[in-house]
Regions:
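Strongly charged
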Residues: 2-10, 14, 25-26, 34-95
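Hydrophobic ligand-binding cavity/cleft-lining segments
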Residues: 31
């Protein structure tokens, strides 16, 4: 895997959107995450799908729609303050 890419399940866990990597993998495997890269939108259906800084993700979590832009991949699952530096919130798309 390239240095500038990371698996979606690992990144969701590092960014603290999921408590465990297994839950992050389940979110991806169920097709509940949308990825926008270079203007092309696709549904993520595998936990092994790679993401890069600049990609945008949209997913439902905790009954809320979450839209973010990936700013960094991170090296570890750090404290919440460190996790918040991995992404920038976006306005969710209109339903």
């Amino acid at each position: 895997m390239a240095e500038d890419a990371c698996r979606i399940d690992v990144w969701l866990w590092r960014a603290r959107f999921c408590k465990t990597r297994s839950l992050a993998a389940k979110l991806a495997d169920e097709g509940r995450v949308r990825l926008t890269r270079g203007g092309a939108e696709s549904r993520i259906d595998k936990a092994s799908r790679t993401i890069r800084p600049g990609d945008e993700l949209v997913f439902a979590l905790g009954g809320r729609l979450t839209a973010i832009r990936i700013e960094a991949l991170g090296e570890r699952r750090g404290p919440p303050a460190e996790a918040r530096t991995l992404y920038a919130p976006l306005d969710p798309p209109a339903a």
